[in-house]
Amino acid sequence: MPRAPRCPAVRSLLRSRYREVWPLATFVRRLGLEGSRLVQPGDPKVFRTLVAQCLVCVPWGSQPPPADLSFHQVSSLKELVSRVVQKLCERGERNVLAFGFALLNGARGGPPMAFTTSVHSYLPNSVTESLCVSGAWMLLLSRVGDDLLVYLLSHCALYLLVPPSCAYQVCGSPLYQICATTDTWSSVPAGYRPTRPVGGNFTNLGSAHQIKNSGHQEAPKPQALPSRGTKRLLSLTSTNVPSAKKARFEPALRVDKGPHRQVVPTPSGKTWAPSPAASPKVPPAAKNLSLKGKASDPSLSGSVCCKHKPSSSSLLSSPPQDAEKLRPFTETRHFLYSRGGGQEELNPSFLLNSLPPSLTGARRLVEIIFLGSRPRTSGPFCRTRRLPRRYWQMRPLFQQLLMNHAKCQYVRFLRSHCRFRTANQRVPDAMDTSPSHLTSLLRLHSSPWQVYGFLRACLRELVPAGLWGTRHNERRFLKNVKKFISLGKYAKLSLQELMWRVKVEDCHWLRSSPEKDTVPAAEHRLRERILAMFLFWLMDTYVVQLLRSFFYITETTFQKNRLFFYRKSVWSKLQSIGIRQQLERVQLRELSQEEVKHHQDTWLAMPICRLRFIPKLNGLRPIVNMSYGMDTRAFGKKKQTQCFTQSLKTLFSVLNYERTKHPNLMGASVLGTSDSYRIWRTFVLRVRALDQTPRMYFVKADVTGAYDAIPQDKLVEIVANIIRRSESMYCIRQYAVVQKDSQGQVHKSFRRQVSTLSDLQPYMGQFTKHLQDSDASALRNSVVIEQSISMNETGSSLLHFFLRFVRHSVVKIDGRFYVQCQGIPQGSSLSTLLCSLCFGDMENKLFAEVQQDGLLLRFVDDFLLVTPHLAHAKAFLSTLVHGVPEYGCMINLQKTVVNFPVETGALGGAAPHQLPAHCLFPWCGLLLDTRTLEVFCDYSGYGRTSIKMSLTFQGVSRAGKTMRYKLLSVLRLKCHGLFLDLQVNSLQTVCINIYKIFLLQAYRFHACVIRLPFGQHVRKNHAFFLGIISNLASCCYAILKVKNPGVSLRAKGAPGSFPPEATRWLCYQAFLLKLAAHSVTYKCLLGPLRTAQKQLCRKLPEATMTLLKTAADPALSTDFQTILD
């Protein structure tokens, strides 16, 4: 029998998802004597290959094979597969084998497919079709019989390995939907996992010895007992087992399957606690009860943790695949971009506004917060169950909370704490759209400290002292409020952080009876969870609603992910100015009510987009968010909206396919740094091959309003020429890829592959092999799951959809509806590609001669011309200045840069910014040496920004490991060949680039350290942090070697030698420069770093040291001095 492919990473991935993973031959052999005859002498090679490559995966909770298993074949293969597909469809199970099949109903008519009574195929399934006609599978059926093959297809998951390192799924639940056991346990704190406790610490920062082995798969090392300060955190995510009597009064919680996923009580008090000695039954996962993006009504959020009664039908060997994830997050995105006018008042629909300040209202509030009842804004209160005594006793306190809310003067607090920072404290008139008035309005944002003062005043007015228990608990919560509003756009605040150092025993309202001398552990954990529910509701509902009611919160174009807080009265005026400017700048036609209705009736699948604005330094940038404004709630067109999204993705995939097949369509367009590197490297090597390097003339130009100025007729003509080709029938295959990286992280991605009938790979084995051959780095150690395949996408249907997309996109602005008469809709995946195709056609027709002996690059709407001919440079500049109306191309002279003199009046009186002939020329984040053509990275964009805000770091669980992984991932992105290639750049330039990369990493290192949770400090485990710095140096040098194959960097005494000690010296120097500015925090690191650097100095040659000191000259890194952190 052929040797089975090894594919160790795929096998490891499958073992983390399934209870058992066996080769097919082994699985069948374990079932009895007849199974040992699966492979026999003389079997065809294709059958032997199938048996060798097939893996049988048994899911957790799967029933065993039938006891009376027969190895006799009764049915044909096609009949058997059809019966299995029908059973899967009837049970409503998602199974790869049944993708593309559905039960017949009124909407899906037609005769059933063969051997079924009520199933039809609405999309091809290449896996199922190839299985039905495969001779190897027919032979397998004859060997194993109907019973076993039905069991394998219905209850197991089959995978076929595809050398060298991948596999594809044949049947079973899609792998991307199966929760990993290892991932589940990572969400449960160490103290409550079924492991034997030995040394270590809570944040898993590890020792120096652990760091060396961290690149390998971790063994299941037992975890340490938590420190005193973290005991409460651990009990939040544990479950207790109260007695049977307690169960009557303290109902357990379960997750309601309703739309808001609230936590509701069940009559059972049984819960689960993991035992080190046995494999436990595991309850289903608790849901994250944060808003899940429904920020428009934060009052609907409720409880935060739940308990489940395990199913009596679950196997004793069931894994923790659905173990509780009692660590929800409240996210800053919940209070972003709030709607409404300029009214500064609490939303009338807010929960506390709808409850009367009485014991009845208090009871309802207690049920919503702690028992998961859904909030009701109208109608009589219904008593569906008796309130447990513990919660009954809480009513007076929550009645006091409702009374405090009713008399709280929110507007007075707002005006007191969030005053306008102007002399006369008046907001400029919104009717004045002059730049000075717009700038003055943009400066009227409230600082986080002012917003915190407002929230603190409201909370102190609202929450009775009895609910806090002590001032200590109140101060802890207020500190978390201040932290919450200081986070960046994508940040989260976890429940563990919210409960850290909160004293549960001080909250007497949590007790169900008078205090005894000792409190059982189960009772203490229950009180802890109840307090967590209240604090989470207070933060995720009340605080978020206050922010959404009184502020418009948004990011800006100049401060990365930092959030700016504008009072509603200020933002309404800013928005009015932005709308007027948008209507003046863009050709929009307002639709009448009849036209809007006609649009809804005719173009059911087209979305109605919404317009919002992002502040700039001196203006507002309009953002048309197509995915945000689908408006399915208003029109009830969810399925049509999904159809639109799928059609948009299909069109995008087809245009990308044509772009790849015909690269000239994109003209001079580059899609990123890798494209720029490939083209720039070829150009530099060609220029340096000349006898004498000519002087180069540089032109940088930026198109004004590129998306809004493109003529629609011209764009339609260009796209029609692309997809109206002879091979205009496209095949679209949608598939998922699941892979595990070197750090053990599992990643899922969903992709589309376009082909024509001439290059179609019809079967999944061929397709997976083709993917590995075409791009082995992108598809390595992966499992491929086919989702669907469409064989009849015609160019005419795609063009019809494109016409609708361009000419009938409706934007809703300030309650009115407009259709765009010129330009292309922004905010979709197509926008950038369409812009590149339009300007690519312009370049092919107008600028072919300009590129002679030179190079023309364009990143979306930013042009760069490098040419040895001054006449070509001037002609190119003149053409762009005068504009190309046919393509809507007009450049912004204020952003145009050249390195040669331009005669006065040559461009109609205007003059671009002129740099010296020899300089570092800026373009799209790069600095290009105009004489040597070497490349540096431009770090000026980091000036006056916060690295802490730009770096999203969620370090609650395994903070140290997360920090190390984050820093290494960012380093790999920054160490690009464009900066490290020694054929493009000199060794000195590469040294400067490496040093600046390390210096930026030092800033990121500091940003991660100051955000470590639970009071973790560098001094507690300085060896770990020194290991991170050392790992960064080693990783950078490894990348440097990969980017320079064939170059001997270690050659001693050679002019281009660059040993690993040199990289390490640059790394230590960069970190010493940054960490010395925070000497109190990093005192324990500075000494070892200085000692290690001195040791390196003794090893490195004098010439190398001179080179390194030149690269680390502070005069070359002045951009970093303006970084805020």
Swiss-Prot record:
Motif interval(s): TFLY: 332-337
Region (CTE): 929-1125
Function, in words: Telomerase is a ribonucleoprotein enzyme essential for the replication of chromosome termini in most eukaryotes. Active in progenitor and cancer cells. Inactive, or very low activity, in normal somatic cells. Catalytic component of the teleromerase holoenzyme complex whose main activity is the elongation of telomeres by acting as a reverse transcriptase that adds simple sequence repeats to chromosome ends by copying a template sequence within the RNA component of the enzyme.
Enzyme class: transferase
Top-level taxonomic group: Eukaryota
Residues modified to Phosphotyrosine: Y697
Biased composition (Polar residues): 206-216
Modified residues (Phosphoserine): S447
Subcellular location per the Swiss-Prot or TrEMBL entry: Nucleus, Nucleolus; Nucleus, Nucleoplasm; Nucleus; Chromosome, Telomere
Region feature RNA-interacting domain 1, mapped onto this chain: 1-239
Composition bias type Basic and acidic residues, residue spans: 247-259
Any one of the GO BP annotations: positive regulation of protein localization to nucleolus
Family: Belongs to the reverse transcriptase family. Telomerase subfamily.
Pfam families named among the record's database cross-references: RVT_1, Telomerase_RBD, TERT_C
PROSITE patterns, A to Z: RT_POL
CDD domains noted in UniProt: TERT
Reverse transcriptase domain: residues covered: 595-928
Subunit structure, interactors included: Catalytic component of the telomerase holoenzyme complex composed of one molecule of TERT, one molecule of WRAP53/TCAB1, two molecules of H/ACA ribonucleoprotein complex subunits DKC1, NOP10, NHP2 and GAR1, and a telomerase RNA template component (TERC). The telomerase holoenzyme complex is associated with TEP1, SMG6/EST1A and POT1. The molecular chaperone HSP90/P23 complex is required for correct assembly and stabilization of the active telomerase. Interacts directly with HSP90A and PTGES3.
RNA-interacting domain 2 as annotated region, ranges: 329-540
Protein name: Telomerase reverse transcriptase
Marked site: Required for nucleotide incorporation and primer extension rate: V860
Matching InterPro entries: DNA/RNA_pol_sf, RT_dom, Telomerase_RBD, Telomerase_RT, TERT_C
PANTHER family, A to Z: TELOMERASE REVERSE TRANSCRIPTASE (PTHR12066:SF0)
An example Gene Ontology CC term for this record: mitochondrion
